[in-house]
Amino acid sequence: IPTPFPRMTWKEAMDQYGSDKPERRFGMKLTDVSSIFENSGFKVFASAVSNGGVVKAINAKGFGSASVGQIDALTKTAVEAGAKGLAYIKVREEDWRSPISKFLSDEEKQKLTEALDIETGDLVLFAAGPWEPSCDILGRVRLQCAEFMELLKDNKERDFLWVIEFPLVGWDEEEQRWVAIHHPFTRPVKEDEQKLLSGELSADLRAQAYDVVLNGTELGGGSIRIHERDLQSAMFKALGITEEQAREQFGHILDAFSFGAPPHGGLALGLDRLVMMICNAESIREVIAFPKNNRGAD
């Protein structure tokens, strides 16, 4: 196993593979084609871009022969991930067979061909909307395409990867407040510390949080933790925790930080996931040693 493992930021992983645990043993990367559809006659794509979202696409090379059942299965995967449907194009020698083809201009088709290296026999699939959900939807569709195409059949490669710089905070629409993506003690990257201290909150704040990934499966995760009182207090404030609540719930931690605490962090491996991969099992339910339901029975 070659070391050190390569590193990829969370944003790069989502943008290119549509997953925070990317399967990199085959291509079919996500491509941003938003600029092609800014003024498109296909209003679904044009409105996604005008509303600040994106249009992402993948080219499943040579999969233009996908059956109706396979297209239906891909559509179901997209819908279950939050899409309203799944736009696709089957590229044939005589035409582009697609429910959306009639809305695309010749110029848009030419630009798509160049951006995605489209050839006869390809299957092009799209997702449109806010960036993160669109990446996630197309990432799931990408994996299912690979399964249908048997791209990983007999593949013995071990692709280890560190995914780093996960988001520090995210906006909870239901609660209308910022929440910690990992946990409230996660340290921001050095470049973002001052933003947290000054209350400049956004989903772009990056955490010193990381996962180790093997062949598209998360083996474990961890983070570097905050060890200064002022930074920890700023994090609590960002999450809507008042000074009184912080004192009541976490006073012992803040006091300890006042006297000085060493930089610290860690990593927890999911051994059940590792055993699952070794055994070629489909689920950790097949390998965990503990009872699998609340009655203590299999």
Residue ranges and their predicted role:
Residues 1-298:
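Class II aminoacyl-tRNA synthetase catalytic cores and aaRS-like
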